[in-house]
Structure formats: structure tokens, C-alpha cells
Amino acid sequence: MSIESSKGVWKSGPGRGRVRPKGRQLDDLAWSQVQDLLGQRPRRRDLLIEFLHLIQDAYGHLSAAHLRALAEEMRLSQAEVYEVATFYAHFDVVKEGETPPPALTVRVCDSLSCELAGAAQLQEALQQGLDPKSVRVVRAPCMGRCDTAPMLELGHHHIDHATPEKVLAAISAGHTHAESPDYEDLAAYRSAGGYARLEELRAGGDWQEVQAQIKQSGLRGLGGAGFPSGTKWGFVRSNAGPRYLAVNGDEGEPGTFKDRYYLERTPHLFLEGMLIAAWAVEAETCFIYMRDEYPAVLHILAQEIAALEAAGLVPAGYIDLRRGAGAYICGEESAMIESIEGKRGLPRHRPPFVAAVGIHNRPTLVHNVETLLWVARVVREGPECLNAVEHNGRTGLRSYSVSGRVKKPGVHLLPAGSTITDIIAACGGMLEGHIFSAYQPGGPSSGLLPASIHDVPLDFDTLQPLGTFIGSAAVVVLSDQDSPRAAALNMLRFFEDESCGQCTPCRVGC
């Protein structure tokens, strides 16, 4: 093959030449727009999902021209960029010749709690009452606000106890952005002694003494798996560095909202726990993977991480906040790590486990948000804050996310040995006119239990004889006015939608 110097064209045969490479051509305007959005950010492969968010946020969709330009800018194949963009539900990929979606999207939650509260009727009313050319109305999986069902997301603005009237009023007022609640900021947290223990440990603490405290407390992973937290630290430390810490904030199990509840109120209790764990395993970087359904939390964390950097408590860039994109499977730790690396969120085969081969193939400590809240408390108050609490033969405390037919849904911090009877009582009892009939003990993955099983402690290891488990302690209470069959179909529909399709039984059946 030679170059025809007079034309600057690659020649590969008589009369054959090509001025541009084969395939979809690069649009100069789209390339310029992508370059402007990315600015001075490094064009690293692991930032691909962050860059897709920038384009989606700016233009409301991902056009073929922008995807082509992003591939060029990052020196990736178009296929790589396209497969990642189409994997995640929150990216609207628009092919050439297709009409982009309307500028405004209403996502109506279709989780079990919201369905019980009339979400289907709400969605139907909105589809009939809004102009589809200007507003798109779609159903969406749980957004972690089950205590205020039915709820929806208008742009990035959540409307609790939603009605068509509330939605129309919000559209008219232009309320489409997230609203941050009042929370304890860095100054308030430090005034009450926050970060003092972290600074003491950094000045001369023994990580093994802290690990012993965590073990004595009985703290286990509170994202659902329940692995002993202190033991996990030892596994990660046994592998040569550099090491990382990853926070699993992808609270996607329907009915679960405890992490959001705490992060919207006391973000620094979580952040200090994270930094203590990072100190213990000598983590080079902390990655926080937070679900896209929590825009207010993302804003709060971005603000407070910047405050930590300004105060000199962490160097710039030490905490890397990453934004999910609407994939339930990324709640699984290895799928989350794939997503942090800018890939599709497909779970890895194990072994090796992430404690040895995690982010960028380095040892990685993975913890849930609530677990790290308790790390901070145990290190500050001592292991007794957990192990001194006993009820029904169980030790410790649990944050139960309770929704459904109870008077006071919400996050209830109760002894880990609490039964469903205890939990309903903590919620003020059943709603008027409703008789307790069944419950979901730990999200849809745990199935349904009848009201007759009301005296079993809802904790780790207590529900396995019944063929279920506590998981993330997402409790949904049903009454005699609800159909167990309809509830089961709701759960099955969720898993049908959210299956990544990697495993054959999930994809085609057993």
C-alpha cells in the first residue's frame, strides 16, 4: 500500500482510494461539543460513564454523532462506547434518523410500595393528561423513597406522595432539579468532635486494634451479604498494595432507602467511617459509587468532599465520587467495580475475589454506606454501641426500611432481634381499616412471608430455615386488601427488567 502524494490518499489498488476511514464519519460540531463538555478532564477509560452523563445531562440524550465523537476523543472503538451506553437505563441512545425524546421525562416508580399506593393509576393519569411531544412519562424501578409512595421523578426533582396536580404544578413552576434537604455539614460535624478520632488514628493509631474493635462489635456488612466487616479488612491487608476502597452506594433493592436517609442527614458520619476504613487498609483512593436516582445525595457528597479537601482532611482527588446510571446489577460488588472502571456492569467470575483483585486488578475493600456509619460509631463509642444491645437472642442494631400499609413508614433503628410484630408496632401499627396479611422481609429477593410467621427475629441467619433471608432489611407490609399474586408479579417484573442476562438460568430459565 502506498501514498499518492499529489492527493494525499491511501492507494490500495488501481483507481481505489479513500480520503477518510471507513465507518461512521466524525461530525466536527459534535466533536467540538464533546471536547467542550470534557474540558481539561483526563481522557481515561474508567471515566467513560462519567462522560456519557455529561452528554446526557447537556443534551437530554446520546446521539450517534456524540457517541462517535466521544469514541474519537477517548481513542476507543465506537462499539465499546455504544455497548456501555446501551447497557444503562438512564442513557437515552438515539440512533441516526431517530427522533430524540422530549426534553422532560417523568419517571413513575413502579416498585411494590408505590404500586400499593396507586402508582399505576398515577402513571395512566399523567400519560392521558400530558402532551407526549413535550413530556415523556415512563415507569421506572424503585427510587429509594418508598416511605413517601407513590413517588416520581420529574427531571431530577422528586415528588413525594405524587398526584397529577402536584406534577402539573411542578412542571408549570419549572421545578425539575434536585432539592437538597437540611443536613449536618462539615463545620457542624467537627464542632461536635467529628474527625477527631480519625486524626488521632492517623497520628499514631494501630489498625489491628481498630480491627479488633470492629470484630468485637459484631458488625457485619449491611448491604445484604452480612460478611464480618473486620475480617474483610484482614483479607484486603494481606494482599500487597496499592489498595483501594469502594463504597457500594447503589442502593437498588426495591424497598430499601436507609442509606439515602442517613446520607441526606449525616453525610460526615459516613465519610469519617469510610476514611477510617481506608486508613486501616492503607487505601490509595476511595471510590464512592452512588446511584443516579439520588441526585440530592450526589450534590451533598460533592459539596462535602470539596469541604474536606479545603480543610486539609483529604488531599484533592483522594475521594472519587462516581455516578451510577440505573442498573440494579451494579449493586453486586464486582459489577459495581466493572462500572467504576467505565464498563458494562457485568458480574465477574470468582475467584479471584475483589479483596485480592478488585478495581484496576488491585486489592479492594468494598463496604456498604450503613456499614461505614457504624465503623465511625464503633471506633468513637466502642464496640458496646452494638454488642451491648440484645433482643430475642440476637445482638446489635438494624436499620429497617419500612413501607407499605403502616401508619409511619420510614427508617426505624431497632434491635437486630426485632420481629415483624415489633417493626409494625414501631411504625405506629397498621393503617386504619387494614389487617396485616403478609410481608417482604428483605426486598423482592426475599419473597413474601405470611402474617402467621410473625415471631421470627429479622436478622442475619434467622430466616434461612424458611427459605429466605433479611438482605438489606427492606420490609414491605401488606394487608388483607392486597393481592399476594399481584405482589409476586410485581417482583417478577422487576427481575425480568433488571436481569443483566449474563447467566443462563436468569436469561432463559432453569
Question: What residues fall within each predicted segment?
Answer:
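Accessory "access/gating" subregions that flank catalytic or transport cores
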Residues: L201-N239, A388, S401, L413, ...
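Hydrophobic alpha-helical positions that pack around
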Residues: L298-A416, G428-L431
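Iron-sulfur (Fe-S) cluster-binding modules
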Residues: M1-A64, R68-A71, Q78-A79, E83, ...
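Conserved phosphate/anionic-ligand binding catalytic regions in large, soluble enzymes, centered on
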Residues: K215-F235, G326-E338, E496-V508
